[in-house]
UniProtKB/Swiss-Prot annotation:
GO terms for molecular function: DNA-binding transcription repressor activity, RNA polymerase II-specific; RNA polymerase II cis-regulatory region sequence-specific DNA binding; zinc ion binding. Residues 496-513 have a biased composition (Basic and acidic residues). A zinc finger (C3H1-type) spans 155-178. Keywords: DNA-binding, Metal-binding, Nucleus, Repressor, Transcription, Transcription regulation, Zinc, Zinc-finger. It is found in: Nucleus. Pfam families: G-patch. This is Zinc finger CCCH-type with G patch domain-containing protein. Transcription repressor.
Length: 513
């Protein structure tokens, strides 16, 4: 009796775990047979004579053997069905993972301090079957990290080209990390709009590794960012990186903002309807049309907004345009704010506000009376006029150096009359300069003559030393001829100055007499 009850419990447990309908029908029939057998055994146990007990015992043994054989057959059928289900599941997983080859993802990497997820590229599916942490069959994927931070994560360049001579265990670089398919997460693309001061980032250095640092300043126009690298092993801790060489890291504040934005977006999506969305679109279009129409009747200043950014590296007008500002309209959501920037004003030093108001009233209430911009423009006009006068005055002024360059060093006249006119003009020009200026010019020309004579002596020595080289002799002769012409010009200047000085000395003697 106890054996029948134990067999009945086993059948009931198998019936709870059975998933196939045919198997459940067989188990139900076996359960009914056992229940009937138990009922008959209880009913006939008291009425049967003692001499029939051995025959009854034999029948019970036969029934027990039959029951065991049926249970073993059911277990074999269940195990074969489970194996078929597992093979079908693995085939589906391999098909799914094979289609993912070449896609980007976020894969885990085991560091000495824990597990961290990094962006990676799926490059293949491994043949080995594993059981994940949840006890479910899974396949492994081979991934290459796109932002490696350690040497063991750095992809082998020879392996990518199919020319690596080492296997995965002996190569110092990565041939691809093996991760389970269930641990793969969604790819996190870099969001450069998050770049701001003190933002943690990964920066790419020449060693092909991504090092951690913090942002110092960002230039969104040229897409350049200055980063201070963490650690003391970098010679230049502050460097400029392009946006393509940076990967902004996610902070706790970003996660909170994303969660709040997702919650608000989902609540708004549930509360709004298609009709409300269309109404909002119509209102937005009407608002923009009204803003454009308003800009046509708005006061147009002489300088456009943001014109000063032409001389600076400011990006204020570009940021305003990205935030929805329409050029020509005023500030504010309705476009009725100011159009021109608030100008700076400087009040007179040491004067009270009442005195400043009196000065403004005396100027007929001019609001720009103390404007810095007006003062700067006035100063620019005065400086421009002064520069023009100075230019005219300097252009008309003729000093002794200009005279010598124009008259003495200039091209000579071809006729006798022109030479006489030039000499007369030269004499008149020299007479206009003081004796001190003539003395200074005489000393300068004497120094030039001595320097030119030394150069001629060096060229002459070179001619004597290189008498066998025809090409060099030709070049040296050209130099010698040029030096002679310059020396003749300087000597002519010296004679003119000496003549003028001698004339002045003679006049002084005559006046003293």
């Amino acid at each position: 009796m106890e054996e029948y009850e134990a067999q009945l419990l086993v059948v009931e447990q198998a019936l709870e775990n059975a998933a196939d309908d045919a198997q459940r029908q067989e188990l139900l029939a076996l359960k009914n047979n056992l229940q009937e057998l138990l009922a008959l055994t209880r009913d006939t146990g008291d009425e049967a004579p003692t001499d029939e007990l051995p025959q009854q015992g034999n029948d019970l043994d036969d029934e027990l053997q039959r029951l065991k054989s049926e249970l073993s057959a059911l277990e074999a059928a269940g195990s074969s069905q489970t194996a078929l289900d597992e093979e079908r599941q693995l085939a589906d997983l391999r098909t799914k993972y094979t289609a993912m080859v070449g896609e980007k993802c976020s894969a885990p990497h085991e560091h000495s301090w824990g597990t961290c997820y990094h962006n990676a590229l799926i490059c293949g599916v491994d043949d080995e079957v594993v059981i994940n942490s949840e006890g479910v069959l899974d396949a492994r994927l081979r991934v290459l990290f796109t932002n490696p931070t350690h040497r063991e994560m750095l992809p082998c360049s020879y392996y990518l080209e199919g020319e690596c001579r080492f296997d995965e265990a002996k190569c110092r670089f990565s041939h691809g990390a093996l991760v389970t398919g269930s641990s793969i997460r969604k790819y996190n693309p870099p969001d450069f709009h998050k770049l701001s001061r003190s933002r943690p980032v990964f920066a790419l250095l020449p060693d092909r590794l991504w090092h951690r640092g913090r942002v110092l300043c960002v230039n969104f126009v040229e897409q350049v960012c200055r980063v201070r690298l963490d650690g003391q092993d970098h010679k230049e801790r502050e460097r400029d990186f392009k946006f393509e060489e940076l990967y902004p890291l996610t902070t706790d504040q970003d996660e909170d903002d994303e969660l709040s934005s997702e919650e608000s977006t989902s609540s708004m999506r549930d509360a709004s309807s298609d009709e409300a969305e269309s109404d909002m679109d119509d209102l937005e279009e009407a608002r923009r049309a009204r803003m454009v129409e308003l800009s046509l009747f708005t006061y147009k200043p002489t300088d456009r907004l943001g014109a000063w950014e032409e001389f600076t590296r400011g990006i204020g007008s570009k940021l305003m345009e990205k935030m929805g500002y329409i050029h020509g309209t005023g500030l504010g959501s309705d476009g009725r704010g100011i159009v021109t920037p608030v100008s700076a004003q400087i009040l007179p030093q040491g004067r009270s506000l009442d005195a400043c108001m009196e000065l403004r009233e005396a100027a007929n209430g001019d609001k720009d009376y103390f404007s810095v911009e007006r003062k700067l423009k006035r100063a620019q006009r005065r400086q421009r006029k002064a520069d023009e006068k100075a230019y005219v005055r300097e252009s008309q002024r003729v000093d002794v150096f200009t005279f010598l360059n124009d008259r003495v060093l200039g091209p000579g006249e071809s006729t006798q009359q022109s030479e006489q006119v030039a000499k007369k003009a030269k004499t008149n020009e020299l007479q206009q300069h003081s004796t001190k200026t003539l003395n200074v010019e005489t000393v300068r020309i004497a120094d030039e003559i001595r320097r030119k004579q030394r150069d001629m002596a060096k060229v002459k020595q070179s001619l004597e030393r290189n008498s066998g080289d025809a090409q060099l002799q030709k070049r040296l002769q050209v130099q010698m001829q040029s030096h002679k012409q310059e020396l003749a010009t300087l000597q002519a200047q010296e004679r003119s100055l000496s003549k003028e000085q001698q004339t002045r000395k003679s006049k002084n003697k005559m006046f003293e007499f």
